[in-house]
Each structure stands twice: as C-alpha cells, then as structure tokens.
C-alpha cells in the first residue's frame, strides 16, 4: 500500500509544470537586515513593475521607510506599475491587544494624500479570503521587482526588517527569472485582483465587510477552485535545476497541500522541516510517524515558546493569545514523549530556536538533497484549511544548490538547542497561573482542538 502511495506521489511531482533554472539565478539571503537591504535596492532599480503580496504592511518606521522608497521611485517613473496586496481584514484592524487608533489602511490613505502623484493611482488593495479574519487570510507571499522574485514569509514591519534591536527570523530567497516573475504577476492580476471582492485600501470610502459578504464567499470559492500559476514554457520534471510555483486554498483540491504530502512520501534518507508553531495537520503527523517507522531520519526546527510572536513574558499583563505558545509547546512535549526512543537514538532530531527576545517565523521543507520548498505555509491545520497559501518548489537533482542549502540550514541551526528528552520541555503545572487556568478550561470544554484548527 505504501509503495503505491509513494509511486503516486512521485508521479504527482513529476507532472507538475517546472521552469528550468540556472544556479546563478537564485541567491539565498541570510538575515532580515539583508532582506531589507535587498528590498530597497530592488525598489530603486525597478523600471517596469513592483508587485507585493504580504499579510500586512505595518505603519511603523520600517513600513514608512519602504513606502517612501516606493513613492520616490514612482515619482521618478510615473509609468511604473505598483500594486501591493494585503489582507483586507488585517489592514483595517489594530494589532492584537493594542488600543483602538488609526489603522494601516488609514495610513495608506494619508500617504496617498501626502504624495499626491499626478495620476494618483491606487497602490494598496485589500484581499478578503473569508468574511472574517479568523476563518482565512491572505498568506500568499512574494515580492516581484521587474524580473526578480524576492520570496519570504516575512511581511513589512520593524521586526521583520530588523529596523531596531529586535528581529523576526525568516527565510529569504532572491530568484531572477523573467517567466517566474511573469507567472506570479499574472496570478495576481488574473485571480487575486478580482474587483468584485477586492477593493483599494488607500481610499476613505471603503465598503464595510458585511456589505460585500456574498461577493467574498463567491471570490473564495472561485479562487479555491480555479487559482493556479500558469507557465508558458513549462516542462515536466526535468533532470535539471528547476522551480514550480504552487497555490492552495481550502481543504480539498489544494495543490500546495498535496505537494507537501507528496514530498513527505518521497523521503529516501532525511526530511528537514521548519515551522514556527508546532501544530501539524493530522495527515502530516501520520506521515512523520511512518517515516520514523521506516527508519528515515527527520529533523524538525521549531521556535521555542519564548521565540513565538504571541509570547507574553510572565511579568506582563496576560492576554488570551499569550496562551498559544504554551499550547504549541504542550503539543511538542507529547510528540517528543511519543517518539522518545527515536530522539534518544538520534533518528529524530528536534531543535528549539531561541535568540534572546527575537522571534522565529521560519517555514519550509527539505527532502534529501533534491527538493527545497519555499513557502509561507506554517504546516498547521489553519494553513491546510483556511488561509490562501503559495510556495515555490525547487528541484535540484544535481545538487547545484547544495552549498547554499547547507549554509542556510547551518545559519538556522545556529541559535538552536537539540532536545535530548521530552522532560526538558515544561509541562502544564509549570506554566504561569493564567496560562494553566486557560489551558485547563480549553481542555475541559474541548476547545483546545478548535483553537488548534484556527490558530
């Protein structure tokens, strides 16, 4: 049975459309500061287009600096095509736990008024993946500058761009490939920018969500069923370095989910996974267990609870979202207890990332030295069912990128600790009192399962 599944997975991957790549066309960036430097450099050199898809673009010092760069280059070149796609709901609310004030969308309006470009174009667009943020957001990643794709799970704000002391660690790849860039831009224009549900954010007369609920539902359904990247000169899996862009939305017919599952079935020696939140969908849990049963090696690099962006230090006032890092840690503890023998033998390596009070946002999959998945997908039930996600699958049959891959992985491991035993992780009775109360309440009313599905 497993042989049949493995063969089918191999056929699925072989049938994906790929674009041939040269090794010199892809560059792995090593830090959030380098990512910011590249964004600014690529903006300044853009001649025909700048397309950005991100969860949010924050009103803060880094957000202002990058937006000033965009407006400056737009002033110099009015014909430059600039489009920024942000989650509709996220742009119009304040940060969790923050006092009510002007939103990011309000700031986009102010900036448009401040700069007053001659043709006064809309640049920011709100993409509603569902009628409520909790049931789905725009988690599609990738910045396009002319023929260059800068791919990362990062959004635009102070910590993602290491504006001050703190940073949020992600992965960053720069791929210079005209057809890949065209494919990503065409996907935005053909599928994401459906103006029956997608509205400009840099205007004051935005519709209220409840006024366009029907349009949003129809938009989500159409995007889930039809959204895909098209490649003009695609080839079936060639025996050369190549890349395939992927999209997925919803629990069924989700190409990105299917590819991730197929990758897990293609492991011959070793699987490496990065995720900030230890909360795998059941299907991936089963596949990891099967790999371990079959003697394959698995390495999981996950953020320590302190490196979670929801973490609240015990001395600060507690908010409900602050329980999430503890919930993820309790998941991890159970997992490590279950596979205690494999951890002791070194077959399963679990690494916890922590660097002071900086945060960890990495996600990705590496299969042997053949497949590299760049994605914003957190490999959790929410990504599997609710959010719009994308990814770039790189196939490297001749290990042309091996040196860059090993360098990236070693950088990721730099601030990690290998777990030797599950008891190194705290358990419920060691958590702060408010966290204990909330997690016990969740368990009592069976809300913990629901929380894991949507967060």
Swiss-Prot record:
GO BP term, example: cardiolipin biosynthetic process
UniProt-annotated location(s): Cytoplasm; Cell inner membrane
Pfam families from the UniProt entry: PLDc, PLDc_2
Tree of life domain: Bacteria
Catalyzed reactions per annotation: a CDP-1,2-diacyl-sn-glycerol + L-serine = a 1,2-diacyl-sn-glycero-3-phospho-L-serine + CMP + H(+)
Protein keywords: Cell inner membrane, Cell membrane, Cytoplasm, Lipid biosynthesis, Lipid metabolism, Membrane, Phospholipid biosynthesis, Phospholipid metabolism, Repeat, Transferase
Residue ranges constituting the PLD phosphodiesterase domain according to the UniProt record: 134-160, 356-383
EC number(s) stated in the UniProt entry for this protein: 2.7.8.8
One Gene Ontology term, aspect cellular component: cytosol
SUPFAM superfamilies: Phospholipase D/nuclease
Assembly notes: Multimeric.
Protein's name according to its UniProt entry: CDP-diacylglycerol--serine O-phosphatidyltransferase
Species name: Haemophilus influenzae (strain ATCC 51907 / DSM 11121 / KW20 / Rd)
Lineage: Bacteria, Pseudomonadati, Pseudomonadota, Gammaproteobacteria, Pasteurellales
Designated gene of the protein: pssA
